């Protein structure tokens, strides 16, 4: 074979090897998620999406409800307006819930902005939070992701980003016994309240948490829906005042406070520092590691001490009016830490209660009777979290 022919064969073989190597390298880039130059031109800065605490599913009389928060931080140099948020099944992208328009506005909060603000725009370098609740039906996803559509000013136009994968937490622990006797009690809570427990972050110890994510405030009423039998400004005239507060399970006492004074009048209750908001309280450590909190207890009524072992139904103290309170009630919540301000709120179920009805309008608390439960619907509820502003009765 002539020398020229040998050189031509080697050259052709080198070209083939370069072509194969180029294709192989391109495959590696694609597999690694590294954009080729043409794709890089379409990339754009937008939101950093985060779910800081796992989405939690909890059973109510309306079925399985999921509670979560989506944090959106704007890393661009221009304001981004959130126009739509979707929760999707991470396995196949099936849309599980979607929020837009006024519904999205009601769920959105810009950190540091006035509570009444309705705009869903996140300025550069700021963080917004979308408080999300959605109903499960037949599908029980193992994990979810989020798709956020947004509008940017000028030529940037509209875009969307998908991310914030999170594993759904289905465990709610062993159902608990009643924290109070009898009733009727209004189970006061509502996810949509902009300054309600469900939306209040406490940022201590370097972390932002929502201790009251699933908190319930229990207010005693009579058959006519009244909260008092005399002077509404006198704490002692409220129906629930002094009611025995009960251990919801066999547990160990983790923390107590019993020395805070109580305002002589409802209207005269002063503002309190964050560490004093709970008033007098008892925290018990459940055997599954969760902590149950009983807050705003009557001064001098706490009947247990730290380290003491208590049993379900045992009296821990009395309902009172200490701390940040607008009237005598029992604040009850469950969290993952023995601190009133530095724990993440966790879902809980009561093993049994009677559902008498509900208040559609919280403005009617103390003014009128609740809307009674439909006679055809089951009154006895088991292994459930009380629905928003439900009126319940526990066993005597």
Give the role of each language-model region.
Residues 52-53, 62-69:
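Short, solvent-exposed loop/turn segments enriched in Ser/Thr/Gly
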Residues 72-79:
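Asparagine-centered strand-capping/turn motif at beta-strand->loop junctions
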Residues 251-253, 307-319:
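A structural signal for short beta-strand/turn segments enriched in small hydrophobics and glycine
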Residues 197-247, 256-275, 396:
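Short glycine/threonine/proline-enriched tight-turn/helix- or strand-capping micro-motif at secondary-structure
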Residues 170-189, 196-200, 206, 229, ...:
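Acidic, glycine-rich catalytic/binding loops that coordinate metals and/or anionic ligands
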């Amino acid at each position: 074979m002539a020398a020229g022919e040998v050189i031509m064969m080697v050259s052709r073989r080198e070209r083939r090897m370069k072509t194969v190597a180029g294709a192989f390298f391109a495959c590696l880039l694609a597999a690694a998620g590294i954009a080729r130059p043409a794709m890089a031109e379409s990339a754009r800065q937008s939101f950093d999406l985060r779910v800081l605490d796992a989405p939690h599913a909890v059973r109510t009389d309306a079925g399985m409800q999921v509670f979560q928060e989506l944090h959106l931080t704007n890393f661009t140099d221009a304001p981004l307006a959130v126009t739509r948020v979707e929760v999707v099944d991470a396995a196949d992208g099936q849309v599980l819930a979607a929020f837009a328009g006024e519904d999205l506005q009601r769920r959105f909060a810009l950190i540091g902005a006035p509570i009444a603000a309705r705009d869903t725009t996140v300025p550069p370098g700021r963080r917004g939070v979308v408080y999300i609740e959605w109903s499960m039906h037949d599908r029980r996803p193992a994990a979810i992701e989020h798709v956020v559509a947004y509008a940017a000013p000028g030529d940037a136009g509209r875009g969307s980003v998908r991310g914030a994968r999170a594993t759904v937490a289905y465990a709610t622990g062993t159902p608990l016994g009643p924290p109070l006797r009898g009733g009727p009690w209004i189970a006061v809570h509502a996810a949509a309240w902009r300054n309600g427990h469900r939306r209040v972050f406490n940022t201590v110890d370097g972390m932002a948490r929502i201790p009251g994510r699933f908190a319930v405030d229990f207010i005693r009423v009579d058959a006519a829906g009244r909260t008092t039998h005399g002077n509404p400004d006198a704490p002692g005239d409220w129906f629930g005042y002094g009611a025995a507060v009960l251990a919801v399970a066999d547990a160990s006492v983790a923390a107590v406070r019993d020395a805070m004074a109580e305002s002589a009048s409802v209207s005269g209750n002063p503002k309190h520092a964050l560490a004093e908001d709970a008033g007098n309280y008892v925290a018990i450590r459940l055997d599954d590691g969760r902590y149950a909190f009983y807050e705003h207890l009557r001064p001098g009524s706490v009947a247990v001490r730290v380290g003491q072992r208590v049993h379900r139904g045992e009296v821990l103290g009395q309902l009172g009016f200490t701390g940040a309170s607008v009237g005598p009630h029992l604040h009850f919540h469950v969290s993952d830490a023995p601190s009133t301000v530095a724990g993440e709120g966790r879902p809980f179920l009561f093993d049994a209660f009677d559902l008498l009805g509900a208040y559609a309008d919280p403005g009617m608390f103390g003014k009128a009777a609740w809307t009674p439960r439909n006679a055809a619907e089951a009154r006895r509820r088991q292994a459930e979290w009380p629905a928003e502003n439900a009126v319940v009765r526990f066993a005597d």
